[in-house]
Amino acid sequence: MTAGGYTLLDGLRLMELQMNKRQAADLTDSVTCLREGAPFYQVLKSLSFHKEAVGICYFAETHGELPASMIQSGELLERKIAQADQLKRVLRYPLFLIFTVAVMFYMLQSIIIPQFSGIYQSMNMETSRSTDMLFAFFQHIDLVIILLVLFTAGIGIYYWLVFKKKSPARQMLICIRIPLVGKLVKLFNSYFFSLQLSSLLKSGLSIYDSLNAFKHQTFLPFYRCEAEQLIERLKAGESIESAICGSLFYETDLSKVISHGQLSGRLDRELFTYSQFILQRLEHKAQKWTGILQPMIYGFVAAMILLVYLSMLVPMYQMMNQM
């Protein structure tokens, strides 16, 4: 709407007509805050918008391109929602199968396996090694579940008591070292940093002033700390491309893009084009891993179902052979 000539307040009033009561009440409060002089990004933050979307609008108010940046933040949120919906569709049926097989495992452990074991003991039959292994598995499955619960609880405790107390740079370093996840984190860092730096440079700000814009925001602590580090290195006489090149948090080709952009005199354009390439790579990797995850889950479910059948058939065949 703002791109079509509406003021921000007029656009919000029109949106209010299409919302439910709770959303309309939030929007009314937002309009009041804007009239009182609150920045638009603070209004979004108070409404619990995604922090990356809030960040985009913060930088937009710095360089004066709020309509275009609102479109960018909307597209970012739409992509995140679409990826989350795709993941839900992929996982919905496999998770239902896992739940069903888990119920079957419980019935086997609590009813069927004890009956087979009692029959073997009452008839003085010897069990084969495969049957012993199946019985032992179901006898100790509770221990496996307890260990999984303890492991999950341990991760939660570590996150709240240790991870959250670390510095933003240290938190990001831990995330980057996680297999598979780390590559996606580096790609997103490169995408977000290059896109926002491009917008700030396009508005006429210098690299130093653009980094100061990153430094003075409060809702993206990692980028604030990164800006502080980069500013200190620039003051020491180091170029921004060499400072980025030595960082573990970005793709290695980001520094090359910055160097090429400075040589061509169109750093803002080079960074924006690079950010779109990175966005395509992110979407490709998300689709790739979603496609890999579903067959893996189906394979796990198939193995569980096979184990269920073996646990019932193997003891029966052995009993028939010994009779």
From Swiss-Prot:
GO terms for biological process: establishment of competence for transformation; protein secretion. The chain crosses the membrane at residues 93-113, 143-163, 296-316. Keywords: Cell membrane, Competence, Membrane, Transmembrane, Transmembrane helix, Transport. GO terms for cellular component: plasma membrane. Pfam families: T2SSF (PF00482). It is a multi-pass membrane protein. The keyword DNA damage does not apply. It is found in: Cell membrane. Its main location: membrane. Required for transformation and DNA binding. NCBIfam families: T4P_ComGB. Belongs to the GSP F family. This is ComG operon protein 2. It comes from Bacillus subtilis (strain 168).
